[in-house]
Regions:
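Beta-rich interaction/scaffold domains
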Residues: 6-9, 19-159
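ATP-dependent phospho-/nucleotidyl transfer catalytic cores
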Residues: 295-425
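Conserved oxyanion/phosphate-binding beta-strand-loop segments in alpha/beta enzyme cores
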Residues: 182-244, 377-383
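Middle-to-C-terminal accessory/interaction subdomains
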Residues: 216, 365-433, 439-441, 446-579
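Extracellular interaction modules
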Residues: 131-136, 144-147, 183, 214-218, ...
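A conserved hydrophobic secondary-structure block that centers on an alpha-helix together
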Residues: 232-286, 379-382, 389-413
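Secondary-structure capping and domain/repeat boundary segments
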Residues: 79-90, 570-641
Length: 641
């Protein structure tokens, strides 16, 4: 009996499968039509740009801003700003500034293009709806032909931070982002976190800024006002930098370096403020709004009078000789101030960091780009070139107390000591190679050379494998490191460490590391959603903001402990010298019993252009062995198979 029922069941299963197959075959054309329609909806709603996206990268295909705007009332007197809807996959987001009343928003869109429904209720354009940032809502866009696209809508809001809204002439960032040097005029509105208007002014230029940062989707920008403006209480100026911090998942490394320098120096230090930035209504992310390192009244005051900073260009011709580039102006006055920036790699590609109009000179330690005067004459550039060669020669020969005393009449020792301390702790891979500034005061202000201000430390503080190490001076060695060989300079570094760095760490820096993450957290959440699939992080980044912040705090404490041992000479360190047949050599220091890291070996190979490292007896150096004494490693151009 049981066998009979089994046969009946199998017959029924086969019949069901047969009829399902027939049903699919009969309806396959209509199902394909539905699939095509769904694709058409996605294509039409996402806009024509989607056709030009990389079809193999789903994140790029699906991420875009739609012409749907949210408007929330302000807590203060600032004009209400509309923000665009951002969609990624089947998720949609409105990123609201901190000053808004976010419990309700008005939605605006083109009703001739499609209808918008939230929780199955049609929302006419201009209608106010209640929202909760903790909730998600079903949103449907329906075109006139009935095709639909469905999303899960979330409303996110920042807090504690000011918001900056920039509108460009073409209402798009495409042209600006296409190439460095492209720019558009525009308008900027800055609103503080309580809804008050901080700045409302015309922009002469919005353009890209930086070099390495150009390779990531979240760009760094420079904005130039038509007239000087005081932005976020940092003093009136024409030029401002919006640092994206795209390489830094903590968002805090640049600000940490700037605050360290500000707290320890009596010279000029960059001011900066975190803000949420919107371009043409599109949320661009969390940015660090910074003073540009330049000569100016509220910057580094190097001119005889304020009018010199805004004087029209003479449009002189750019001339170039073997080791200098200058303008054919006839200015023979060399007594003014100078601002220079290191561009230390003496290879042709290094010039790619500068435009054809940028002046430079080559000294013993490398190439320096001229930041002031704007159009430097041959007389002036020859003067500052000779001056820097003299300084470098004095530093190289600074051994005795008398050498130190004479050098102190030429350079500001404290600023050099402070920069040494910051580079020691930050351990930035670009230290002394790029973005390292020096300025020489005019003769009527004493004429001394100052180190600083520090700039661009987002790849420091453990953000690359090369600087996650206990090695000292495992980066480019500059003037400060060369000067550290003098015992009297070491004494000054030690004094400043105790007089300024230790108290600063116990108060301002510790508070910064503990309190800033809370201030940034909601803004960072929005930034992470906006750029989640496009962030180009470095070797030692963690997956989330909280973990990266914890690591930054840990790394800072570890490097501060190493600095204490090194400066106070309480720890045992050994010098490892790297040398090549041509006679060039570099060195770093390793704590007793620690490893000479692979990243330092790789860095030295790249720096000295060698293939392998060998000991004095010719044996190949075996990585991974602890260092217990001074040693010399010899480089070879031979490539180790």
């Amino acid at each position: 009996m049981r066998g009979k029922w089994n046969i009946i069941i199998w017959i029924l299963v086969l019949l069901a499968a047969f009829y399902c197959g027939m049903y699919w075959y009969a309806n396959r054309e209509s199902m394909e039509e539905v699939h095509k329609t769904a694709l058409l909806v996605e294509e039409e709603i996402s806009g024509p740009d989607s056709e030009n996206r990389d079809e193999t990268d789903d994140s790029l295909v699906q991420e875009r801003f739609l012409e749907i705007f949210a408007e929330a009332s302000s807590e203060g007197d600032a004009a209400i700003q509309k923000v665009k809807l951002f969609v990624t996959g089947k998720n949609a987001y409105f990123f609201l500034p901190s000053y808004c009343k976010a419990d309700s928003i008005a939605l605006y869109y083109d009703e001739h293009q499609y209808a918008l429904a939230v929780e199955e209720r049609i929302i006419p354009s201009g209608t106010m709806i209640s929202v909760d940032s903790a909730a998600a809502y079903a949103m449907t866009l329906t075109k006139e032909d009935g095709t639909k696209a469905e999303y899960e809508l979330s409303v996110m809001q920042s807090e504690n931070l000011p918001s900056i809204f920039i509108t460009t002439a073409n209402h798009s960032m495409d042209y600006i982002n296409d190439m460095k040097g492209n720019y558009e005029p525009g308008h900027l509105v800055c609103v503080n976190d309580s809804g008050g208007t901080d700045c409302d002014a015309a922009l002469e230029k919005v353009k890209l800024h930086g070099f390495t940062s150009l390779s990531v989707p979240k760009k760094t920008y420079q904005v130039d006002f038509s007239k000087e403006q005081d932005l976020l209480g940092m003093g009136s100026a024409l030029h401002w930098i919006f640092q994206a911090n795209a390489y830094d998942k903590s968002y805090m490394r640049n600000k940490l370096a700037y605050e360290m320098f500000r707290g320890m120096t009596s010279g000029y230090a960059v001011e900066s403020v975190f803000a949420d930035v919107y371009f043409n209504g599109e949320y661009a992310g969390n940015y660090l709004i910074c003073e540009k390192v330049e000569a100016g009244v509220n910057r580094i005051d190097l001119a005889d009078n304020a009018a010199a900073y805004t004087a029209d260009s003479t449009k002189g011709q750019v001339l170039e000789e073997e080791d200098i580039r200058y303008y054919d102006t006839q200015d023979a006055d060399t007594s003014g101030g100078y601002l220079i920036e290191t561009q230390n790699v003496l290879v042709p590609s290094d010039l790619q960091r500068m435009s054809e109009e940028d002046s430079y000179f080559v000294s013993y330690s490398g190439r320096y780009e001229i930041r002031w005067p704007k159009e430097i004459s041959k007389t002036q550039i020859s003067y500052i070139q000779d001056y820097m060669k003299q300084v470098e020669t004095q530093i190289a020969g600074c051994v005795t107390e008398e050498d130190y005393r004479q050098l102190a009449e030429v350079i500001d020792m404290d600023s050099f000591a402070v920069m040494y301390l910051i580079d020691l702790i930050a351990n930035d891979v670009d230290a002394n190679a790029y973005s390292t500034f020096y300025y020489k005061l005019p003769e009527h202000q004493g004429g001394k050379l100052y180190a600083g201000p520090v700039w661009d430390y987002d790849r420091g503080f453990g953000n690359e494998e090369r600087n996650v190490m206990v090695n000292v001076n495992g980066y480019w060695n500059g003037l400060c490191e060369a000067l550290y060989r003098n015992p009297f300079f070491r004494n000054r570094v030690r004094d400043l460490y105790h007089e300024r760095f230790v108290p600063l760490t116990e108060t301002i820096l510790r508070a910064f590391l503990e309190e800033t993450p809370d201030r940034l957290s909601l803004s960072v959440r929005m930034d992470s959603v906006r750029w989640q699939n496009n962030l180009d992080r470095l070797n030692y980044s963690y997956d989330c903001f909280d973990d990266e912040v914890a690591f930054l705090s840990y790394y800072f404490d570890e490097r501060a402990a190493i600095a204490s041992e090194w400066i106070n000479e309480t720890g045992v360190y050994h010098m490892v010298t790297f040398t090549v047949p041509e006679g060039t050599s570099k060195s770093c220091f390793v704590r007793d019993g620690e490893l000479l890291t692979a990243s330092v070996l790789s860095f030295m190979k790249e720096e000295l252009e060698c293939g392998i490292w060998s000991r004095e007896d010719g044996s190949v150096y075996q990585q991974g062995r602890p260092v217990f004494g001074n040693m010399t490693l010899y480089g070879s151009t031979e490539i180790l198979e």
